[in-house]
Design a protein with these regions (language model features):
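Short, solvent-exposed loop/turn elements at beta->coil junctions and helix N-caps
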Residues: 80-85
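Short, low-complexity, Pro/Ser/Thr/Gly-rich segments in the mature regions of secreted, periplasmic
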Residues: 141-148
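N-terminal signal peptide c-region/cleavage motif recognized by signal peptidases
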Residues: 17, 28-29
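Short, surface-exposed ligand-recognition loops at beta-strand->loop->(often short) alpha-helix junctions
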Residues: 49-58
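Bacterial N-terminal signal peptides that target proteins for export
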Residues: 1-21
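Active-site-flanking beta-strand signature of metal-NTP-handling nucleotidyl enzymes
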Residues: 42-46, 94
């Protein structure tokens, strides 16, 4: 399955999960990668776990990552997994973060990556081997008609 296909499937799963929860999201790609729009941005991230490691990934997020994201200024919006096997149910985590700006996102990710608490949690969660096979990230701007901005 290609990276684009996984991203599209992840986004469709996110939308389906949001719809089931009574939420409505509308996304648009940034106009220019070279010049990010000012203001709040969303980041859609898709993690593909190594075979049999999704539970370990979910545990790491549940017990450590969400709190660390918040500590470093990232807003946890929604965390989802696909419902169907063909969409990566066994190994895929898709989540949405909100950042004050694209620059703030960069600063938050740098601080998160350098946080000794994160390094300890990551190393402990990988004591039985690596967890993540791949990560994709897409920054999104809400449209002018999006109920969530």
């Amino acid at each position: 399955m290609t990276r684009f296909t996984r991203l599209a499937l992840g986004l469709s799963g996110l939308i389906a999960s949001a719809s089931a929860a009574g939420l409505a999201f509308t996304f648009a790609a940034p106009a220019s990668a070279a010049k990010p729009a000012p203001g709040r941005v969303f980041e859609l991230r898709t993690y593909v776990a190594l075979p049999g490691r999704l539970d370990a990934l979910n545990t790491r997020f549940r017990e450590h990552t969400l709190a660390l994201f918040k500590k470093h200024g990232m807003e946890n919006v929604v965390y989802t997994t696909p419902q169907d096997d063909k969409d990566g149910k066994a190994d895929t985590l898709v989540y949405l973060l909100a950042h004050k700006s694209r620059d703030a996102a960069k600063e938050s990710w740098t601080a998160f990556g350098n946080d000794p608490v994160w390094k300890t949690a990551r190393d402990a969660s990988e004591k039985d081997g690596k967890i993540v096979k791949s990560v994709t990230s897409v920054f999104l701007d809400p449209t002018d008609y999006s109920p969530m901005k």
